[in-house]
Amino acid sequence: MNRRMFKSKIHRATVTHADLHYEGSVTIDADLLEAADILPYEAVDIWNVTRGSRLTTYALAGARGSGVVCINGAAAHLNQPGDLVIIATFADMDDAEARRHTPRVLRVDGRNRPLAEQPPETPGPLAPN
């Protein structure tokens, strides 16, 4: 049996540009792609924390060290500069690999620079009984 697992994410990145007239995709600083284990042309989900929108597109590598997160094409209607987004990837794995898998989570600051400390992801608060 295969399972679809959360593979990696860039957590709370800031959209720097939105280019409605580009063909599509999201351009992301190549350093961030590498740190988050996202390849150019890999499918990514973008969850907009500011607006609540969600979409799927693919990643393109932007200039290293630029901090760029540019939403391209029609998705620019749903994401604007200054919005906070989560950029996530998923991968299909067999059951044994899925049970050993640890996703990569890259937290960034307001300028899309990796935070010095990268604490592990923890579950949210429990609902009261």
Swiss-Prot record:
Compositional bias per record (Pro residues), positions renumbered to this chain: 120-129
The UniProt record lists the keyword Glycoprotein: no
Cofactor: binding comment: Binds 1 pyruvoyl group covalently per subunit.
EC number(s) per entry: 4.1.1.11
GO molecular function, a single term: aspartate 1-decarboxylase activity
Active site: S25, Y58
Cofactor: pyruvate
Broadest EC class assigned to this enzyme: lyase
Gene3D superfamilies: 2.40.40.20
Keywords of the record: Autocatalytic cleavage, Cytoplasm, Decarboxylase, Lyase, Pantothenate biosynthesis, Pyruvate, Schiff base, Zymogen
CDD domains tied to this protein: Asp_decarbox
Modified residues (Pyruvic acid (Ser)): S25
Residue segments, region Disordered: 99-129
Disulfide bonds listed in the record: none
Cellular localisation: Cytoplasm
SUPFAM superfamilies the record matches: ADC-like
Catalysis: reaction(s): L-aspartate + H(+) = beta-alanine + CO2
Family the entry assigns: Belongs to the PanD family.
Function: Catalyzes the pyruvoyl-dependent decarboxylation of aspartate to produce beta-alanine.
HAMAP family: PanD
Protein name: Aspartate 1-decarboxylase
Organism lineage: Bacteria, Pseudomonadati, Myxococcota, Polyangia, Polyangiales
Record gene name: panD
